[in-house]
Amino acid sequence: MTWRPVLARTAVLRHDRARGTDLLLLPERVVVLHGRAGGVLRLCDGSRAVPEIVAELSEAFPGAPVAAEVPEFLTALRKEGWLR
């Protein structure tokens, strides 16, 4: 997979300090991100391919099911139009 994910032009990733959570701001919609989703999306800057993102997260979180879950998560967000 040579796709280098990046947020859609209309999407903005923000951290809500009051709630202590990350938010994905979209036109007419706000998505509250849970767990490490915000951290994963911060790596989606267009400079890394999916395998590079997986490798970086696998190193940061040994034993976590990164290789199985992250590509699936990114693909789902791409289908929603939140990543390109």
Regions found by a protein language model. Give the residues of each.
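Long, charge-rich, low-complexity alpha-helical segments
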Residues: 29-84
